[in-house]
Amino acid sequence: MAWTGDHMTEIHELGVAESAKKIREGSLSSVELAEALLTRIKAHSELKAWVYLDRDAVLAAAQTCDAAHRKGEGKGALHGVPVALKDIYCTAGIPTTACSKVYANHVPNEDATSVVRLKAAGAI
């Protein structure tokens, strides 16, 4: 839980800006945030909201971000913040099907421009 001024907020309820701020300040780690979000996803798996989710890759990226942050090497405004991408944005090495049988086995070799920009800002 995190203090947001007038009440306690569950970590998974934090917005992107607040999450990024807390990571920059050191009051929240990328791993803590990623674990909270992954726990929430698992708790509601019956929704089947995720076409593809690589938990190990998310946690490894969060650990890398935390290590960089400790060295003062934050990457950008979204450093260490996990983001979800709709299954229509090409992401290199990750199945991107657009929920279509036509693209059932599509694994792009490069990222969409929006994904490139998110990664450049430090998003996981």
Give the ranges of each region predicted by the language model.
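Cytochrome P450 core scaffold surrounding the K-helix E-X-X-R motif
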Residues: 44-48, 91-101
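Flexible, acidic active-site loops/lids enriched in D/E/S/T/G that coordinate Mg2+ and/or position polar
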Residues: 55-78, 85, 104-109, 118
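Short, well-ordered beta-strand elements within core beta-sheets of diverse protein domains
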Residues: 19-25, 84, 103-107
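Conserved small-residue hinge/capping positions at short loops/turns
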Residues: 75-97
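A glycine-rich phosphate/pyrophosphate-binding beta-strand-loop-alpha-helix module
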Residues: 113-124
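An N-terminal boundary/leader segment
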Residues: 1-60
